[in-house]
Amino acid sequence: LEAELESPIDELFAQFDDKAIAAASIAQVHRATTPEGAEVAVKVLRPGIEAAFARDLDLARWAAERIERTRPELRRLRPVEAVQTIIRSVEIELDLRFEAAAADELRENFAEEPDFQVPTVDWTRTGRRVMTTGWIDAAPINDITPDTVDAEKLKMIVATFAKVFFLQVCRDGFFHADMHPGNLFVDENGRVSLVDFGIMGRLDKNNRKFLAEILYGFIERDYVKVAEVHFQAGLVPQNASKDEFAQALRSVGEPIFGQSIKDISGGNLLAQLFEITEKFNMPTQTPLLLLQKTMVVVEGV
């Protein structure tokens, strides 16, 4: 930390807790207080993590290239492109200046949203291997249950979470791609907070438009319209049957229409969708990989 910020730790912080409050494979987080009296969270990369990831990513790249060479039937999955997408994401994740910039951008996007907050970045105490943000005084979202909050507040929290997710994806095209419960917090007023901005995704305007039309089509149970959007977006080979594809979509949509989200198996749904991509020889859409991963995690939350 001192080497990265080129200052003694007792000059950077009036108080610094040596015991990490959170730890993961890439970094750990410490609670601290600045000389100005601000409570902050300090994220520090683990020593040697860059070299360790470089080895793992080289192996993943080699495996993807081998699959494309030796398994023609799997080339539609674009394994090399998929791995390159992951590599770009990891490279950004290993530079905490990029993570700080992502937090800053997300905070700016939701500056007018009173029920959602993103911690402020302390740029004077942030570098490639260290990031300092304001402290979020809130409880982990897993602690929020019908036993701990009243029904109205619980509804508000769920509505805020859903609204924030869809605004990120459909309005801004810039979304938090690691929205698991460990990164979600709720304060005593029901305000939702996000932390850990190392994995972020982006969607261009066309992809946002197509995604919104697909979601609306499913809500309206207009499977022909959903099929047409898939063809317009180039998600399905043009020689495929549009009617058969609409029929396949109906087989996915109708069984879950009107069900509570808790009664829908995300795993079974994904398995069925994957069968459809195989049946219609649909290539992997690498720009959507992070979104697909995020939607699986959000469904779990």
Mark where each language-model region is.
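Conserved catalytic cores of large enzyme domains
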Residues: 1-301
